[in-house]
Amino acid sequence: MSAQVSLELHLRISQFLFHEASLLDDWKFRDWLAQLDEEIRYTMRTTVNAQTRDRRKGVQPPTTWIFNDTKDQLERRIARLETGMAWAEEPPSRTRHLISNCQISETDIPNVFAVRVNYLLYQAQKERDETFYVGTRFDKVRRLEDDNWRLLERDIVLDQAVITSHNLSVLF
């Protein structure tokens, strides 16, 4: 296991993640994009249910990408949301990103830190459409020379194997 970080560094990285979540909840997508590293990897795979005997053998069923985005692709997703023509987001969703169990450790790369958080993402739209997404995120954050932070990687793992939402237009 990699070395854990100091309490001060843990607080700084946690505050960066909380700020990033509030930008998404407030629909400040351009400000959120500014928090992303140019080399961002933003991924989510399908979740599959593996049999216990297969998991014991280390056998994992194949999965499919839901997201495998670069910064350019994320910019295009946001540009589409801004047009008012993204019908899945008319009227716009109200979201709340809750982050907990934040575990942060050093990596082999200087100024890059591995972060594991549990999340609950609540999405409400129209009068009765509500969706909860629950899972774990594996992030990598980079500390810049000016002591600011950038999100370098985000791997989103959903606990649910079946997504019951009408769309998957939210950002995690």
UniProtKB/Swiss-Prot annotation:
Part of the multicomponent 3-phenylpropionate dioxygenase. Converts 3-phenylpropionic acid (PP) and cinnamic acid (CI) into 3-phenylpropionate-dihydrodiol (PP-dihydrodiol) and cinnamic acid-dihydrodiol (CI-dihydrodiol), respectively. Its EC number is 1.14.12.19. Gene3D superfamilies: 3.10.450.50. It catalyses: 3-phenylpropanoate + NADH + O2 + H(+) = 3-(cis-5,6-dihydroxycyclohexa-1,3-dien-1-yl)propanoate + NAD(+); (E)-cinnamate + NADH + O2 + H(+) = (2E)-3-(cis-5,6-dihydroxycyclohexa-1,3-dien-1-yl)prop-2-enoate + NAD(+). It is an enzyme of class 1 (oxidoreductase). One of its GO terms (molecular function) is 3-phenylpropionate dioxygenase activity. Pathway: Aromatic compound metabolism; 3-phenylpropanoate degradation. Keywords: Aromatic hydrocarbons catabolism, Dioxygenase, NAD, Oxidoreductase. It comes from Shigella boydii serotype 4 (strain Sb227). It comes from the Bacteria. The lineage of its organism: Bacteria, Pseudomonadati, Pseudomonadota, Gammaproteobacteria, Enterobacterales. The keyword Oxidoreductase applies. This is 3-phenylpropionate/cinnamic acid dioxygenase subunit beta. Pfam families: Ring_hydroxyl_B. One of its GO terms (biological process) is 3-phenylpropionate catabolic process. NCBIfam families: 3PPDioc_HcaF, PRK10069.1. The gene is hcaF. PANTHER family: 3-PHENYLPROPIONATE_CINNAMIC ACID DIOXYGENASE SUBUNIT BETA (PTHR41534:SF2), BLR3401 PROTEIN (PTHR41534).
